[in-house]
């Protein structure tokens, strides 16, 4: 069987607040245009891309991002927190037009700070792939509960290769209890790469993971000056083999 590859990127844009303390949404869009779009992405996941407080209004020009990247903004109202939001609690996904969406959900995650995930099932060539983007809690016990919630969702959905990407806030290189297969019902794997803080990366908070038969290849952090100024996280990019 010939395997295809999906090029995926994830970036916590810190609500457009740069390392200089300035809030500049256009700077984030420019960084995506100059540092991510040329990579030929199939999937772009953003976190902290809506305002933190209700009504979680959109911060970025998602139409401009779609135009510059060649990707499609996928969030109809069913995938947004509210009419003023661009995503679901700050999580936004853009997909290549070659990926046809077959099912989509938002997943409410427990915790004292409202968190969520966006799940898309897409047709890629002759097969189906599930893409989940999320931003997990800073608290390890809450991350475990949140991953269990995602696992309960997966058990209700048809079996298919799953890609999980986003700011998982897991700083331990060896992983942790949140990655145990019994929580998710599957074993997610991927490289560990330091991505935070952007000015001197020390912690591997941002992850791109997949389960069998997929493999995460060529993972790297994008550390251009423009990107490092735009957010306190670096974006990470990887290729994932899919059927």
Q: Which ranges hold each PLM region?
A:
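Active-site environment of divalent metal-dependent phosphoester hydrolases
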Residues: 16-18, 51-57, 82-83, 139-142, ...
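Residues that flank catalytic or metal-binding motifs in active/ligand-binding sites
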Residues: 4, 88-90, 116-118, 127, ...
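Soluble or luminal CAZymes and related metallo-dependent hydrolases
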Residues: 20-28, 57, 112, 142-149, ...
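Active-site beta-strand/loop signature of hydrolases that rely on acidic residues for catalysis
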Residues: 7-13, 32-57, 130-134, 146, ...
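Catalytic-core segment of enzymes that process non-peptidic bonds
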Residues: 71-108
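Beta-strand-turn-beta hairpins that frame and shape the catalytic cleft
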Residues: 1-9, 95-101, 113-133, 240-243
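N-terminal, active-site-proximal structural segment of metallo-dependent hydrolase catalytic domains
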Residues: 1-68, 75, 80-85, 227, ...
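Metal-dependent phosphoester-hydrolase catalytic domains
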Residues: 99, 105-109, 121-123, 140, ...
């Amino acid at each position: 069987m010939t395997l295809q590859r999906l090029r995926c990127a994830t970036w916590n844009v810190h609500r457009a607040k740069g390392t200089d303390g300035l809030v500049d949404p256009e700077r984030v869009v420019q960084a995506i245009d100059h540092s991510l779009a040329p990579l030929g992405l199939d999937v772009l996941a953003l976190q902290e891309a809506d305002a933190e407080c209700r009504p979680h209004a959109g911060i970025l020009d998602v139409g401009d991002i779609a135009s510059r990247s060649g990707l499609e903004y996928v969030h109809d109202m069913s995938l947004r927190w509210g009419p003023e939001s661009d995503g679901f609690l700050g999580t936004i996904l853009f997909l290549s037009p070659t990926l046809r969406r077959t099912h989509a959900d938002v997943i409410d995650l427990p915790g004292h700070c409202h968190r969520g995930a966006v799940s898309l099932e897409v047709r890629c060539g002759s097969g189906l792939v599930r893409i989940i983007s999320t931003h997990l809690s800073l608290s390890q016990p809450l991350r475990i509960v949140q991953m269990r919630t995602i696992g309960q969702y997966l058990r209700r959905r048809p079996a298919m290769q799953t890609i999980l990407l986003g700011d998982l806030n897991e700083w331990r290189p060896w992983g942790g209890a949140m990655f145990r297969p019994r929580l998710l019902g599957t074993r997610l794997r991927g490289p560990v790469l330091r991505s935070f803080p952007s000015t001197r990366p020390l912690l591997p908070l941002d992850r791109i993971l997949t389960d069998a038969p997929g493999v995460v290849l060529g993972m790297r952090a994008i550390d251009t000056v423009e990107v490092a100024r735009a957010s306190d996280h670096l974006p990470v990019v990887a290729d994932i083999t899919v059927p």
